[in-house]
Amino acid sequence: MNNGFSTGEEDSRGHADQTCCLIDDMERCRNQAGYASYSKRIQKTVAQKRLRLSSDPSAQHIYICDHHKERIQSVRTKRRRKDSEDDSNETDTDLHEFPDLYQLSVSTLRRYKRHFKVQTRQGMKRAQLADTIMKHFKTIPIKEKEIITFFVYMVKMGTNKLDQKNGIGNDTT
């Protein structure tokens, strides 16, 4: 399962003869169906985002084409990032790029949660945990000028604490 879409790797049926099961703006899509399925969860997302997509009741399957899969995923990721930025107290969020925490494993997210003592409820799914951690991550204050100044200083001096720990900066020549 990838972002709510079934990848179909566990499905042995072929999709070469099937077309997308969606009706896009009152017209049935004629693209070849891929391995992504139009699940109840995806239907809910489509309804919330007010996309003009619906499943064709005459379709014998729930597989959708890659075009619609990408369209649904792009709306989902845009919304997630927009919500996260709205919750932030920063005035200029366009200048900041944030890591994609949604790609991290659950154990890594839990380790972050433990380290920063982020309060969450028990049994959260990975996406919910990533949302909570992203909101916390954006609240961590950083002093960009100080960090850049320190970085330039370290480069000019030719020293880096991380390189020395790993044995990289210890040249004996």
UniProtKB/Swiss-Prot annotation:
Zn finger limits (Atypical): 20-68
A Pfam family recorded for this sequence: zf-SAP30
Region annotation (Disordered) ranges: 73-94
GO biological process: regulation of DNA-templated transcription; regulation of G2/M transition of mitotic cell cycle
The entry's keywords: DNA-binding, Metal-binding, Nucleus, Phosphoprotein, Repressor, Transcription, Transcription regulation, Zinc, Zinc-finger
Gene Ontology CC, one term: histone deacetylase complex
Subcellular location: Nucleus
Phosphoserine modifications at: 84, 88
InterPro entries the record matches: His_deAcase_SAP30/SAP30L, SAP30_C_sf, SAP30_Sin3-bd, SAP30_zn-finger
Protein family membership: Belongs to the SAP30 family.
Physiological role: Component of the class 1 Sin3A-histone deacetylase (HDAC1/Rpd3) complex (HDAC). Appears to be a non-essential subunit of this complex which is not required for cell cycle regulation of progression through the G2 phase of the cell cycle.
Protein's UniProt name: Histone deacetylase complex subunit SAP30 homolog
UniProt source species: Drosophila pseudoobscura pseudoobscura (Fruit fly)
Name of the encoding gene: Sap30
